Amino acid sequence: MQDAAPRLTFTLRDEERLMMKIGVFVPIGNNGWLISTHAPQYMPTFELNKAIVQKAEHYHFDFALSMIKLRGFGGKTEFWDHNLESFTLMAGLAAVTSRIQIYATAATLTLPPAIVARMAATIDSISGGRFGVNLVTGWQKPEYEQMGIWPGDDYFSRRYDYLTEYVQVLRDLWGTGKSDFKGDFFTMNDCRVSPQPSVPMKVICAGQSDAGMAFSAQYADFNFCFGKGVNTPTAFAPTAVRMKQAAEQTGRDVGSYVLFMVIADETDDAARAKWEHYKAGADEEALSWLTEQSQKDTRSGTDTNVRQMADPTSAVNINMGTLVGSYASVARMLDEVASVPGAEGVLLTFDDFLSGIETFGERIQPLMQCRAHLPALTQEVA
């Protein structure tokens, strides 16, 4: 028997506002986002991610995003020790989809902005204008030390200065095809990129620190943030408010997209049993690595993403917001997310991506008021 969930009551004005976008955070690294010996164990492949994104497109997901990870956490599960590369993966996925928006992540310490500008323009051509770029500054020092490109620990406090110059070069090249930018980190001398993107290139960021939000307010089209807690869907609201306030200072509209993991089943009890099983198998060695790395940055303050990721409360899934319950309960909680001012969308992960997306599309999404505008499904995806 499926658990009943109370219906939210919205005014017409609220319903018009509550049209929340849904994205999938594809598993570019092994085992997705569960650091547990009890979770599904799998390697990242193009075929797996193709199946995930095609299924997401079938169920009217709005976008797909891949991260970039250059060194994992080890442990019994070898967590994130095995990763594909973001731009090449998303170029492939752009070629086998037709509607869904596609976002790759640039580890900006590893890629010159002029190269990213050209790669993005190429994937814009492949996708027919469906591509955008997520910019990350880099927080896990061993990822870059192993290649001899870590700029020193002062970078922790200057990384958004670096990113500000980086995005200015990108905007020059995408907008005019030329850059003569001169800064502390980058020097462009009649740098050229052509062809330019067919549509304005979307730039996204995932800043939760004051510096990160100030950057997003000035340069990003929207900002990712972590959900918080287990079955506390609106606990992230203060973060969304901070983002709105930062954007108001720049006169721009920059909404928040919130990261959640969905663990759903027929009943609340069945879903909770899954969650407890995953927690019981937590890979303590990999989690210790995460905690150790989070303590390396002593200069960025206490409000960065990595501080939340390593919190012992729910480190088994890096402390992203977690929605555990029946299909109706998860639908209700996602409608609550949509009710938060500034929350324009969610980025979802699943304990099992293929079955999770299908269950979401068939059993959860039809119950969501904030997705009531979607057309009916017309065909099946294998």
Curated annotation (Swiss-Prot):
The keyword Flavoprotein applies. Keywords: Flavoprotein, FMN, Monooxygenase, NADP, Oxidoreductase. FMN binds at residues 68-69, 134, 143, 159-160, 209. GO terms for biological process: alkanesulfonate catabolic process; nitrogen utilization; uracil catabolic process. GO terms for molecular function: alkanesulfonate monooxygenase activity; uracil oxygenase activity. It holds the Pfam family Bac_luciferase. It catalyses: uracil + FMNH2 + NADH + O2 = (Z)-3-ureidoacrylate + FMN + NAD(+) + H2O + H(+); thymine + FMNH2 + NADH + O2 = (Z)-2-methylureidoacrylate + FMN + NAD(+) + H2O + H(+). Induction: Up-regulated by the nitrogen regulatory protein C (NtrC also called GlnG) and repressed by RutR. Coiled coil: none annotated. It comes from the Bacteria. Its EC number is 1.14.99.46. Gene3D superfamilies: Luciferase-like domain. Belongs to the NtaA/SnaA/DszA monooxygenase family. RutA subfamily. The FMN-N(5)-oxide reacts spontaneously with NADH to produce FMN. Requires the flavin reductase RutF to regenerate FMN in vivo. This is Pyrimidine monooxygenase RutA. It comes from Escherichia coli O8 (strain IAI1).
